[in-house]
Regions:
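Conserved nucleotide-binding/hydrolysis modules and their immediate coupling elements
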Residues: 1-98, 113, 136
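Charged, conformationally dynamic linker/hinge segments
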Residues: 82-196
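Conserved cytochrome P450 K-helix/beta-meander segment immediately N-terminal to the heme-binding cysteine loop
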Residues: 200
């Protein structure tokens, strides 16, 4: 069984970092994701050491590995042969600071959304929201520096340039109590005239 503790996304694809928690992992072994229920083939996995990666055919409990092309696996997922095993997840803090992001060029909104979602795969403390009330795209993080780094990565990795601003607040009103209102309308202009009496 393996536990996914990190995901790295760039313009070339996604790399998934994992730790072998129990048993033995062999090349081409098929494991089931306990979160999504999907099966993933562990075709080629490597042991990372700085920028160098060494491919292995077998890994044992305690080994750290990296693999690409896992389609339905994210950080905090557990993969095992039975698919019923789930290891304790890493507790990431909830992001609290938001900035609006606006495309610098026309028609780049879909590209921006797709690129930000790749960043959120990599950093679980980032969050993306397309706010239906304010019609704004919002990116949430733990502070200004993290959000600035995210915007910089959008440009350097995916070629997406955005402008940031303050998010708008969607104000709401609600009915607090029951009231009654009465109104009368009178108009006399020499003819039959007009009269109305309304209660609400």
């Amino acid at each position: 069984s393996v536990f996914v503790f990190k995901t790295v996304s760039d313009q070339f694809g996604k790399q998934t970092y994992f730790k072998v928690m129990s048993g033995t992992l062999r090349r081409d072994m098929t494991l089931k994701n306990s979160a999504s229920g999907s099966e993933e083939k562990m075709a080629h996995f490597y042991s990372p050491c700085g920028k160098k990666q060494t491919e292995y055919e077998v890994m044992h409990a305690g080994d750290i590995g990296v693999i690409s092309k896992l389609v339905r696996t994210a950080t905090n997922d557990t993969l095992s042969q039975s698919g019923t095993l789930t290891f304790r997840k890493i507790d990431f803090p909830e992001p609290y600071m938001a900035k609006s992001v606006v495309a610098s060029g026309k028609g780049d909104e879909d590209k921006i959304a797709a690129s930000i979602l790749k960043l959120t795969d990599e950093d679980p403390t980032l969050k993306f929201e397309n706010n239906a009330e304010t019609k704004q795209m919002l990116i949430y993080g733990m502070g200004d520096m993290q959000l600035d780094v995210a915007v910089s990565r959008l440009k350097s990795r995916y070629g997406v340039t955005v402008q940031t601003g303050e998010p708008e607040i969607a104000y709401r009103e609600t009915i607090k109590k029951r009231v009654q209102v009465e109104g009368k309308h009178k108009k006399q202009s020499g003819g039959s005239g007009q009269y109305g009496h309304v209660k609400i």
